[in-house]
Amino acid sequence: MRVKRGNVARKRRKKILKLAKGFRGAGSKLFRTANQQVMKALRSAYRDRRRKKRDFRRLWITRINAATRAQGLRYHEFIDGLKKANIQLNRKMLARLAFLDPEAFTQVVEAARQSRAS
């Protein structure tokens, strides 16, 4: 007896069209274009979940660098001073501190500067 694929194919197409909901034009209406768009979107999502970690680290370093240069210290000198002072704040916390509480960040910079001098 021949196996007809009606139910299986319909479920597969409905699943893809559901994932493509909100895409523009034929990307959400026609199965073939929707399938291509969904595959591309899933690839981009996978890639960008990994890229996001790099991008945020770059942003934090840029913010820390700007804040430390305003205090007369370069980024690499600041990080070296933190390591020597045994201050274990990660870059995310340092960037938040520089952005939200500049006075506290100034104290951290001074501690790093003093540990570098000694």
From Swiss-Prot:
Entries under Gene3D superfamilies matching the protein: 6.10.160.10, Ribosomal protein L20
GO cellular component: ribonucleoprotein complex; ribosome
BP GO terms, sorted: ribosomal large subunit assembly; translation
Key words, A-Z: Ribonucleoprotein, Ribosomal protein, RNA-binding, rRNA-binding
SUPFAM superfamilies named among the record's database cross-references: Ribosomal protein L20 (SSF74731)
Keyword rRNA-binding: yes
GO MF, one example: rRNA binding
Domain of life of the organism encoding this protein: Bacteria
Pfam families (alphabetical): Ribosomal_L20
Keyword Ribosomal protein: yes
Family, similarity comment: Belongs to the bacterial ribosomal protein bL20 family.
Database matches in HAMAP family: Ribosomal_bL20
Function recorded in the entry: Binds directly to 23S ribosomal RNA and is necessary for the in vitro assembly process of the 50S ribosomal subunit. It is not involved in the protein synthesizing functions of that subunit.
Name of the protein in question: Large ribosomal subunit protein bL20
Native species: Synechococcus sp. (strain JA-2-3B'a(2-13)) (Cyanobacteria bacterium Yellowstone B-Prime)
Organism lineage string: Bacteria, Bacillati, Cyanobacteriota, Cyanophyceae, Synechococcales
Gene of this entry: rplT
